[in-house]
Amino acid sequence: MIKLIVGLGNPGAEYEATRHNAGFWLVDQLARMGGATMRVEGRFHGLAARARLWDQDIWLLKPSTFMNRSGLAVVSLARFYKVLPDEIVVAHDEMDLPAGAAKLKRGGGAGGHNGLKDISAHLSTQDYWRLRLGVGHPRNAPGGAGAGREDVVNFVLKPPRREEQEAIDAAIDRCIEPLGLLARGDAERAMAQLHTTR
């Protein structure tokens, strides 16, 4: 069962269209589907809404703390509504997957993602679900960009190219049905369906 879906990103118009905000894009799509309006919730350090999705009430959250402090928002809402870590899905950008790919997994390390690191620290566990939305990697980008720290930061804080954006949007659409399966407690089918469709 899933009770909370968190999308990671950075607040502000200047970041809205950047690769790092792929998690926000997924949550926005779910809010539209569930007829929910994301509202500023100071006690949860972000925008939150309760949406009716897959015949269940599910909290949606977009932290407004900036990526590296996302854990504060997640733990605030989770504690208030008594949501357990394994009832949380965190959707985030993933450079180790090409644009248009999506993978679902439970637990594991942060893979260098500072938002995940902070969430794990605040929850005192890594045992929550992650929906990894591929955005590609600078070493594979046209123009021969490198893979140093500065290249990575510049890459995730820029908008994807048009064809990449279309691929990411399509991946988000493909995630909806598997998320519904996961929300209803069928994790095995959710992962099988997401990982075999493209």
Curated annotation (Swiss-Prot):
Subcellular location: Cytoplasm
Catalytic activity: an N-acyl-L-alpha-aminoacyl-tRNA + H2O = an N-acyl-L-amino acid + a tRNA + H(+)
Main location: cytoplasm
Enzyme class: hydrolase
Residues under site feature: Discriminates between blocked and unblocked aminoacyl-tRNA: 10
Positions contributing to tRNA binding: 15, 66, 68, 114
EC number: 3.1.1.29
A cellular component term, taken from the record's GO annotations: cytoplasm
CDD domains assigned: PTH
Active site per UniProt: 20 (proton acceptor)
Keyword annotations: Cytoplasm, Hydrolase, RNA-binding, tRNA-binding
SUPFAM superfamilies: Peptidyl-tRNA hydrolase-like (SSF53178)
Entry-linked InterPro entries: Pept_tRNA_hydro, Pept_tRNA_hydro_CS, Pept_tRNA_hydro_sf
Xref: Pfam families: Pept_tRNA_hydro
Function statement: Hydrolyzes ribosome-free peptidyl-tRNAs (with 1 or more amino acids incorporated), which drop off the ribosome during protein synthesis, or as a result of ribosome stalling. Catalyzes the release of premature peptidyl moieties from peptidyl-tRNA molecules trapped in stalled 50S ribosomal subunits, and thus maintains levels of free tRNAs and 50S ribosomes.
Family: Belongs to the PTH family.
Protein name: Peptidyl-tRNA hydrolase
Organism: Cupriavidus necator (strain ATCC 17699 / DSM 428 / KCTC 22496 / NCIMB 10442 / H16 / Stanier 337)
